[in-house]
Amino acid sequence: MAVIKEKAECCTLLVDELYGQLPARVYATLFQRGKLSVRLISQFSKLSARQVKNGLCVLQQHNLLFYSVDANSGEAEYSVNHEYAYNLVRTGKILEMVDNSYGPAGRDVMQNLLLLGQTRISDLVAAYQAKINEVNNDDAWLNDKKPELAIKSKAQLNSVLCRLIEAELIDVIHSKTFQSAHEIEKQVHREVMDVYFSNGIKGTKAKIEFEQRVAEGLRKVREESKTLKRKLAQNGGASKRRKLAVGNETNGAPEEEEDLDPALDPRQVIRINYEKCIVELRSRRLVQYVNETLGETTGYVYGQLLKQLTKNISRCKSDPLIDALTPEEKVTPSVTTNEILDKVKTSIDLTLGIGKIPSKSISKSAAERLTPLAPKDKIPFMNQDDSDDDEEDGDYSDSDEEMDTKKENGDAPVARMSRPEQLRQHLLLLAEGHPGFVRHCGEDEWTVDFKPLMENLRATELDSIIEQTSGRQGLRLIRILRTKGKLGEQALQSLSLMRKVDLQQKMLEMRLVGFAHTQEVPRDNKADPKKSIFLWYCDTEQAYSSLIAKCYATMVHCLQVLEVRRQKDKDVLSLAKRTNVKGKEKDMMRDESYARFAKFLKDERLLMAEMMRIDDTLALLQDY
């Protein structure tokens, strides 16, 4: 798959930042030249074969490479896994997400897997056991305070690994893990042709059967990484095992709960599953949107709903070939109100965030409207007329127009509602409005249509960026072009009610940043530019691509500035790394040196925060 220049540069700098210059040089060569053998990498990078192998070893350990063995020469050829390389920038977000969901123990395990790369379970257990033995050795901590361990026993480590494997945040390395999607597809194609179509594909029916068998083969390859999860599912999920233990009069102590989990095969090699991590980060981002727009209580309810819905969602974007299902299999996952209520903590006050208006002022037909089917795929920008949408929403009672808005969220007495009814009010609130965070798909059943929801949020993000870059006038002009299509300058001027000079200046400004484009239409066959008509138009996909490239370029700039600052303050940073200075910089360093060190740390935090903010935009535009 082709990678834009800015992303290739960003991934190379991230590898350099985390793993050093040698792996980064090898990675940059693979980005520039494509699939290469060790001999060719050495030739193009001017590195020795030994250096190349050392660099490849580091990259392979952290799943940053694909490789395949050439059938003719017998040489292994390597190519970049750019998705895993870019996901290195999301390490902090992933650890924070795991900490919130699985506690410090889960965070500690994920952090070690991120640092170590692919790891055999027995090696991970041995490393933790050595650390536990070291801390439990009282003689080693006579004068120092004994550190607190997140993982205190092998049983706890096994239990945490089981939780993370069941959540698909960790998956298993198998024989085809290090083959690219293109190589796997070619291999499955060959196998299907050899087994089922040795005489060739003849006719439409045979072609459909061929595609189905290829999809089935690719699905089997993808499921190989879920072997540990399937074994755990055979013993029942974590909650089921605890319920069975309670039924057998187990006292529910944490140590005994850990012993309920089956021992994992120590020979299995595991790694971080970034696809599932991105699904969890998407849920986290959606909850943040709801917190900002509808309040924290509604956001908490939405978080519990997403947690239930995404249990069996392994990736944000489905593969059109592998995930092609028959109409009978296309069942949208949904959750009931009671299932969500079971997960909501009793300490959460569900009355918060609900409007206080009389029930007679609410249109039941509109509020309780069901939408059994997901909306058809639409381009968000093509539906600009809100009045048409309002007419299609349903029949509203006349009392809606006469509603006393002063009583909303005011001091009017709140009608007594049961806890399930309070929860339903939050869910109905989520189902209303333009983004459509939730769809009321059945009687007390709720689902989320992620594809149209994310399209709407992308459109909102693009509008926000256009407004910040080109102002309100620029956003207004772009919306006119989206609604009306291609327009000449005179027609655009009459619709926008702007002066010609201001219009030309604003459109030129937006053309330079990639939000607006022009098309030349000649009046005759001579195509004389002086006699041609120039039409303005807005290409949304092109605007997305331009914005994504600029985001990568900005991240590259941040990493380059950080490296320049490191070189500038190299003497101070080397002093701060000394064992007798580390942790006591203010006491051990001179005032001038400490001021430089503190300024560097502040600038580093600002640059990292800027990269995280840009990554939020990138994730929304291309990953979610």
Swiss-Prot record:
GO terms for cellular component: RNA polymerase III complex. Residues 385-403 have a biased composition (Acidic residues). Transmembrane segments: none annotated. The keyword Nucleus applies. The keyword Nucleus applies. Residues 551-572 are annotated as: Leucine-zipper. One of its GO terms (molecular function) is single-stranded DNA binding. One of its GO terms (biological process) is DNA-templated transcription. Keywords: DNA-directed RNA polymerase, Nucleus, Transcription, Zinc. It comes from the Eukaryota. Component of the RNA polymerase III (Pol III) complex consisting of 17 subunits. DNA-dependent RNA polymerase catalyzes the transcription of DNA into RNA using the four ribonucleoside triphosphates as substrates. Specific core component of RNA polymerase III which synthesizes small RNAs, such as 5S rRNA and tRNAs. Belongs to the RNA polymerase beta chain family. PANTHER family: DNA-DIRECTED RNA POLYMERASE III SUBUNIT RPC3 (PTHR12949:SF0), RNA POLYMERASE III DNA DIRECTED -RELATED (PTHR12949). This is DNA-directed RNA polymerase III subunit rpc-3. It comes from Neurospora crassa (strain ATCC 24698 / 74-OR23-1A / CBS 708.71 / DSM 1257 / FGSC 987).
